[in-house]
Amino acid sequence: MKPLIALVGRPNVGKSTLFNRILRQKSAIVDPTPGVTRDRHINPGEWQGKQFLLMDTGGYAPENDSLSVAMLDQTMRAIADADAIIFMVDARSGLTYLDLDIAKILKQTFSDKKIFFAINKVDNPQLALEAAAMVRSGFTEPYLISARDGGGVADMLDDILETLPCPESEDEELDDDSIKLAVLGRPNVGKSSLVNALLGTDRQIVSDVPGTTRDAIDSVLKRNGKEYILIDTAGLRKRTKIDPGIEYYSSLRTERAIERCQVALVLLDAQLGLESQDMKIIHMAIERKKGVLILVNKWDLVEKDSKTSKKFTDNLMMQLGNIGYIPIIFTSALTKKNCYRAIDTAAQIAINRRQKISTSNLNRFLQEALAMRHPASKSGKELKIKYMTQIEAGHPVFAFFCNDPQLLENNFKRFLEKRLRESFDFEGLPITMRFLRK
């Protein structure tokens, strides 16, 4: 499993800026207002060939300068699973009582974890001198960094990753032969009921109260000679509804469950249909190149006739738009209708996700596709695709070698993707297509 590094500190010390700097992308909203809430809290990163997960615990500020119960819940729970902690303070404002409170709690509550003390915003020599006097927090050898400019960040990362175990394989999904399925969805859509129906036991507390399950819990299911790891999680709530503490922490666990899985089973409530939070979960899985299967649960509660499922499917496909390649199964955890069919479908998606197609078969496909539809000319020039191949990545990635990638039209790219799905069964799988000059 990839080690998890948590960024901890009071609001506005630069956690989101460091988060973006380390990941080399603008994943977090950076705002001078203390306590700005981001949409994404945990992302995969890589440094010098070592892979890890980075978590920003920012986003919630106490109402005063003392470490409130809310701050404890929101931050301390969020780092409970972290392998290392970067405790950040601000060189410009110096150590505050809140910094010292956080330092005290980190040492008392997380003494078994590796804690790295980072003094941020050290942007000039004078601030470096002032920062040297800030070691009274109790952490030795602080790292003087500038998250904005990158100063000192590389050395700190080198030291952190030197102390952490590296994954045995590049992809933690491959640690064993089991198929890892994340059971995802908003609170009270029936995730735990589905897992219990599959396992034949009330392994978890099942209640009508949303969010009964708080942590990601792994269960083993054996079926038709295959072993499945079912990762059941608390549902993702809209940010405005996340209770300080436990629900915030559960959302982070959900995001980490997506990192671990091969296929995401996204449950919808048949009586509510597809909502914005469902789309967020689906897009989160697609961004991480996971397989996706939609389960419309509680189908037994819907009044229906012979056309109900088709109408529901047509409406859902219209809402999904360009990700309409995701299969849909109508289930009932209560009656067990289609529950095992969902598992068998997810297994096929996982197998297809790792399929390796020979270059000769791919180029035969390419010639047939080009015979069906020729690329449109652009500015008097014609796109010429010479050949294609599959890139080994653990999920479908294809490279197309052509005379000029800038001549590619989106319509033609969508045509090739659709033909790939039809020819090689990539249902439920995001496909990455790279067009390279040759």
From Swiss-Prot:
GO molecular function terms attached to this record: GTP binding
Task: Tell me the disulfide pairings in this chain.
Answer: none
Family annotation (PANTHER family): GTPASE DER (PTHR43834:SF6)
GTP-binding recorded as keyword = yes
Q: What is this protein called?
A: GTPase Der
Q: What is the lineage of its organism?
A: Bacteria, Pseudomonadati, Chlorobiota, Chlorobiia, Chlorobiales
Tell me one GO biological process term.
ribosome biogenesis
Is Nucleotide-binding one of the keywords UniProt gives this record? yes
Query: What family classification does the UniProt entry report for this protein?
Result: Belongs to the TRAFAC class TrmE-Era-EngA-EngB-Septin-like GTPase superfamily. EngA (Der) GTPase family.
Annotated InterPro entries: G_ENGA, GTP-bd, GTPase_Der, KH_dom-like, KH_dom-like_a/b, P-loop_NTPase, Small_GTP-bd
The family database entries (CDD domains) matched by this protein are listed as: EngA1, EngA2
Recite the UniProt keywords alphabetically: GTP-binding, Nucleotide-binding, Repeat, Ribosome biogenesis
